[in-house]
From Swiss-Prot:
It comes from Aliivibrio fischeri (strain ATCC 700601 / ES114) (Vibrio fischeri). This is DNA mismatch repair protein MutS. GO terms for molecular function: ATP binding; ATP-dependent DNA damage sensor activity; damaged DNA binding; mismatched DNA binding. GO terms for cellular component: cytosol. Keywords: ATP-binding, DNA damage, DNA repair, DNA-binding, Nucleotide-binding. The keyword Hydrolase does not apply. The lineage of its organism: Bacteria, Pseudomonadati, Pseudomonadota, Gammaproteobacteria, Vibrionales. ATP binds at residues 615-622. Coiled coil: none annotated.
């Protein structure tokens, strides 16, 4: 919007342009009566994003003004749509009195709604965190800060590589991300909504320290343990400045900053989070994820805490055993069943407290807070039976807070209106002065009923009624048929089609008295409402501790219920390297299968650090690998696991290289994606890592693929010594255990019955003898005639009777690996086919290609 001067514009438009110049990069909702209106480029953009009409509102400076508008009462729904698309909005309200204003009514921006700083219930995902983050980069090092404004949770970290930074962005998934104008690795910001460019000076260290000390009321940051994290502090300083600018109020619920140390967590990179489908499936949904199975929490704040645990598994055994002990007690005592309904009635206190801190809480927020506090005595009765130390600590923080509960019981009506604007929120008896003015206003109703009856009888007019509207105030209405009976002192105020309306001095006097008492009562109520915040805010820290304790009790109670219902066992955590699972099951697959799940063991230790896994397509190799990783992850969350028994050793990272698809947006092929993920593993895995490798090398020629798979497996086994599950269709790799120590072959078998195949899904020692590719192709619906032809050709290939076209020229491949027998072009092409990855159309095209090679 290029506006050089505002002088040629109307006074109202001059006011709009001034406010817009103060908020140039975001949409401005400009209040006009019962509408919020947008002009110029904002109007065009809003009409596209919200699918609303784009019109014109007169002209200014000789040009028509593009305009779009939305009703003020529907603003929350439109804000939700914009926030979901990564947009920010400045809300401009009328703050002046139209009756006393000369020129346009005074307006100002009262709040700025951004994706990462929303606190309104209607704009937030209930069971997921809503984070705002800031990222700082300097000479290959990163600083990263995140804030959940709905809880005050403020964290900082310093990822030391782009790969680690990308993993943090994937884990935290901020809805809004601040970065400096000179930020270099911009590819990290691609495919994201809510990116916000900020001035470089906002990331300066001295400015950041000053901002943070001002927020926390401290002289330095030593007490928080973050004083040496200079890059992280640069990001945190920008973040806290931005939040203050948008909220336009103090932030009393943000009282500390926490350093996230990588050494404390089991690190999951972006590919691993995606492949394990922790909280999001491969299609981007929530169905059939680990969180869907484990999250039966009673409160939304408990649900959010559980997801944080799942995305940040910890390595500290003391913390994990503390959680496991608590779950064990709740499970064995059956107390989880008593706690669930009590917790459900408490609700999402965490976010109510954030709105209280920002003084944006609505009447029903405080009513819900009151209702939550009323549940604590019953919950306290249940928690008295706790014996485990951590449960007792949580129970102590979740004790009833009688003073706050009593205050809210006295102050707030049982079912208050949505907003304070029209009053009727504070309970009768809370304030004597308010009651007196309310009584005066309410007594008016009785007076009017009495006046109506007296006037009707005095003048013998049975259609006479006393009424009120906002335009004409109080009036006496008489039907047209009886209007001739109206006495002389009745002054006509309004003529309707079927009635006449009058005013009398007595009624006018009463009107002034009533309106004055109502406005006086409303003014007192609004003042008392603000004073109520002043009484509650000193208790904010205690209330937040209570909310945090209830969240964790909810998660632990939920995990106890899941362990009991789903027949999970307690994992044993050891300091040694290794994984030993008996009767392991995939937590998600076993719940969605109609047939019984086949449980399988796994044993990994320094003498058996790599398993070469072979077997048919659809035989269960990927499921077996994923269930191992998920059980290890669940153990490091501190919850029970789907197994008969599980012994889980020290883990620093979990890597997965399972499946791949073209990354067309970045110009990367399937094979390029596969090799990038493999390179990441080979560079970053350690002897304490768990590595899952599935079908390495299948995206290129047989020789290249086998060479890469062999070399990768050998490197992991001999140089890194990582605990590795290596699934492959290259049967040549089953020779590896004969060449190197610490490797073993296992396979998943299948049984053929004529033309049918039955997958056993049971893991057995040793290598598989065939992959049953044609049987799987038949199951996939490849035409029987094609399968028949393929069987014939397979027999030819296996017997070496491969016809060579007269026109073909045999080219001997140089530098062939000694372990690979010389094979024909058709044989190579067949080995490269993986029916699991083919659509019916692709399968048909592949068969045509095979035929052309004969």
């Amino acid at each position: 919007m290029a506006i050089k001067s505002t002088e040629k514009h109307t006074p109202m438009m001059q006011q709009y342009l001034r406010l817009k110049s103060e908020n140039p990069d975001i949409l401005l909702f400009y209040r006009m009566g019962d509408f919020y209106e947008l002009f110029y480029d904002d109007a065009k953009r809003a009409s596209q994003l919200l699918e609303i009409s784009l019109t014109k509102r007169g002209s200014s400076a000789g040009e028509p003004i593009p305009m779009a508008g939305i009703p003020y009462h529907a603003v929350e729904g439109y804000l939700a749509k914009l926030v979901q698309q990564g947009e920010s909005v400045a809300i401009c309200e009328q703050v002046g009195d139209p009756a006393t204003s000369k020129g346009p009514v005074e307006r100002k921006v009262v709040r700025i709604v951004t994706p990462g700083t929303v606190t309104d219930e209607a704009l937030l995902p209930e069971r997921f965190d809503n984070l705002i983050a800031a990222i700082y980069h300097h000479k290959g090092q990163f600083g990263y800060a995140t804030l959940d404004i709905t809880s005050g949770r403020f964290k900082v970290s310093e990822p030391n590589t782009e790969e680690a930074m990308l993993a943090e962005l994937q884990r935290t998934a901020p809805t809004e991300l601040l970065f400096s104008e000179d930020f270099e690795p911009v590819h990290l910001l691609e495919k994201r909504n809510g990116n916000r460019r900020r001035p470089v000076w906002e990331f300066e260290l001295d400015t950041a320290k000053q901002q943070l000390n001002n927020q926390f009321g401290t002289r330095d940051l030593v007490g928080f343990g973050v004083e040496k994290a200079e890059f992280g502090l640069c990001a945190a300083g920008c973040l806290i400045q931005y939040v203050k600018d948008t909220q336009r109020t103090t932030l009393p619920h943000i009282r500390s900053i926490i350093m996230d140390h990588q050494d404390d967590s089991v690190i999951l990179d972006a590919a691993t989070r995606r492949n394990l489908e922790i909280t999001q499936n491969l299609a981007g949904g929530f169905n059939h994820t680990l969180a869907e199975i484990l999250d039966h929490t009673s409160t939304a704040m408990g649900s959010r805490l559980l997801k944080r645990w799942l995305h940040q598994p910890v390595r500290t055994h003391d913390v994990l055993n503390q959680r496991l002990d608590a779950i064990g007690e709740l499970k064995e005592s059956g107390l989880f069943a008593d706690m669930a309904p009590q917790l459900k009635n408490i609700g999402d206190v965490e976010r109510i407290l954030a709105r209280l801190a920002l003084r944006s809480a609505r009447p029903r927020d405080l009513a819900r807070l009151r209702n939550a506090l009323q549940q604590l005595p019953e919950l306290s009765q249940t928690t008295q039976e706790f014996q485990q130390d951590h449960l007792l600590t949580l129970a102590a923080s979740a004790q009833p807070i009688d003073s706050i509960c009593e205050l809210l019981e006295r102050a707030i009506k049982e079912n208050p209106p949505v907003v304070i604007r029209d009053g009727g929120v504070l309970a009768d008896g809370y304030n004597e002065e308010l009651d007196q003015w309310r009584d005066l206003a309410n007594g008016a109703t009785q007076y009017l009923e009495k006046l109506e009856q007296e006037e009707r009888e005095r003048h013998d007019i049975d259609t006479l009624k006393v009424g009120y509207n906002n335009v004409h105030g109080f009036y006496i209405q008489i039907s047209k048929g009886q209007s001739h009976k109206a006495p002389a002192h009745y002054v006509r105020r309004q003529t309707l089609k079927n009635a006449e309306r009058y005013i009398i001095p007595e009624l006018k006097e009463h009107e002034d008295k009533v309106l004055n008492s109502k406005s006086k009562a409303l003014a007192i109520e609004k003042r008392l409402w603000e004073e109520l915040f002043d009484q509650l805010l000193p208790h904010l820290e205690q209330l937040q501790s209570m909310a945090n304790a209830i969240s964790e009790l909810d998660v632990l109670s939920n995990l106890a219920e899941r362990a009991d219902t789903l027949n999970y066992c307690r994992p044993v955590l050891t300091k040694e390297t290794g994984i030993n699972i008996e009767g392991g099951r995939h937590p998600v697959v076993e719940q969605v299968m109609s047939d019984p799940f086949i449980a399988n063991p796994i044993k990994l230790n320094p003498d058996r650090k790599m398993l070469i896994i072979t077997g048919p397509n659809m035989g269960g190799k990927s499921t077996y690998m994923r269930q191992t990783a998920l059980i290890a992850l669940m153990a490091h969350v501190g919850c029970y696991v789907p197994a008969d028994s599980a012994e889980i050793g020290t883990l620093d990272r979990i890597f997965t290289r399972i499946g791949a698809s073209d990354d067309l947006a970045s110009g990367r092929s399937t094979f390029m994606v596969e090799m990038t993920e493999t390179a990441n593993i080979l560079h970053n895995a350690t002897k304490h890592s768990l590595v899952l490798m599935d079908e390495i090398g299948r995206g290129t020629s047989t020789y290249d693929g086998l060479s890469l798979a062999w070399a990768s497996a050998e490197w992991l086994a001999t140089k890194i010594n990582a605990m590795t599950l290596f699934a492959t269709h290259y049967f040549e790799l089953t020779e590896l255990p004969n060449l190197f120590t610490g490797l073993a072959n296992v396979h998943l078998d299948a049984v053929e019955h004529g033309d049918e195949i039955a997958f056993m899904h049971a893991v057995q020692e040793g290598a598989a003898n065939k992959s049953y590719g044609l049987a799987v192709a038949s199951l996939a619906g490849v035409p029987k005639s094609v399968i028949k032809k393929a069987k014939q050709k397979l027999q030819h290939l296996e017997s070496g009777q491969v016809p060579v076209p007269a026109t073909s020229t045999t080219v001997k491949e140089e530098h062939q690996l000694s372990l690979i027998p010389e094979i024909s072009e058709v044989e190579e092409a067949l080995a490269h086919v993986n029916p699991d990855d083919l659509t019916p159309r692709q399968a048909l095209e592949e068969l045509y290609r095979l035929k052309a090679l004969l």
